[in-house]
Amino acid sequence: MEIRLEDRYLREEGSVFLSGVEALVRLVVEKQRRDRVEGQVNQTYISGYEGSPLGGLDLKVVEQLDLLNQLGRTVHQFGINEKTAAAAMLGTQFAASGDVDAFWYGKAHGTMWIPDEVWLANLSGTGQRGSMVLLTGEDHRSKSSVSPGASDWVLRSSLVPTFYPANVAEILRLGLHAVALSRYTGVVTALKLVTPVCDGASTVNLDEARPQIVLPQEEYSKQFNQIVMATRALPMQQELVERKLPLVQEYLRLNEINRIVDADAGGEVGIIATG
């Protein structure tokens, strides 16, 4: 059987060999193909500011723009900095079509630049079918940063549900969940991407990496708030805290995102671990 480098993005079944950064490009491919099966393909917008461990992501996206545009309209813009890219992410949700999936990428130190934009985006919500997903590169060991960095506290303070892939395959599985959750609730979601996962590579079983997404039974009609200002923001924050976040928790429960392993072992002590 002939194997080509393009198979990492083109192959639709079986297994593919991907690096962590390549898996992020494949995530967009999977999202678009999933939409095509459902009969409505969202547009995709990607912007950010490169940095370890996501260095080179922008170039790989540009390399595959022709393929991505064959599957659905895709726009990539190099961010002047992290803040302008985050502002552009929110700006995509103003599209009249309401069908833009926006991805922001940057390292942890860049995430520290954007809490204002992310908080405003969380209050505004997303377009009718749109989503906003942050791809945060975590340089815990200060591989190419002035100091070690992590995005956890910034994301938590902005009430951003954060998925934490432990391997390359989980970038696809949890990335698709991040898009689906943002589309359903209107919240900004994030993928926490650590250096060993981004710099690593592995063979990914595509069937196992594609989740069966289950939405809560409660029908939720999200609203996109074009203007967030003064007292008008108060009911938006109430909606975020009292309606959207409980729906986030229900989504996580239904889709078994936080898995319990060996629960029947009869032990008295449990260990909680992320990633």
Short names for language-model regions:
Residues 1-168, 194-196, 256, 260-268, ...:
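Thiamine diphosphate
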